[in-house]
Amino acid sequence: MAATTLDFLTQQLQLADQLLAGRKAMFEPQDLPGRYGRVVQALDRVLATLNCPAALAGGWAVWRHGYVGRVTQDIDIVLPAVRIDEFLRVAAVAGFDVLTVPAGIWPKVVHKDTGVQVDILPEGERPGTRMRPAPTTIPHPLQLGAMPGKLRYVSLPALMELKLAAARARDEGDIVELLRANPSEVATIRTHVKGVHADYAAALANLIQRAQEQDET
């Protein structure tokens, strides 16, 4: 995570302005401005070399699906479990540093030119916390809306699934804002989540109520 300096805050404000101005034209990860766009280009080169699918999740997916106030520092991508080792090998010679992480921590790389960190969410791993693990694991990126060789955003229902699995306060806040931004998609989201796990369906029902209460105030 970048240090909070005046220069960093200025860059973040400029980024927020760019994102707001280009919101209606930035439909794909490749459309992101500035250093984040350069990281996506570098990731695409790695993915194209491997013909590997990857789904962009996390804060950038939240922004893409309508929570326009959400600006994040890192990039989160879902990769197939069997492709992670070769992804890291190619990334290491394609403009990224592979970080050394403790056992049990998911892989991370840093884009050398921009300093942007890329957090890898491995298919089959269990989100949540050690004290409160999710009842499901991370799906294959192709199930989330990915395609081989190029980074794609996770679909809105899949993003909700991942957020419900993580279940942090920030994730719940993101879900509420996404529900408020996408009222016409609530039924589709509800159907998807119900098919994943009953716990998620119950949690989503509570968050839908929270979103409705906020809209009424």
Predicted regions located by residue number:
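Compositionally biased terminal segments of proteins
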Residues: A2-T217
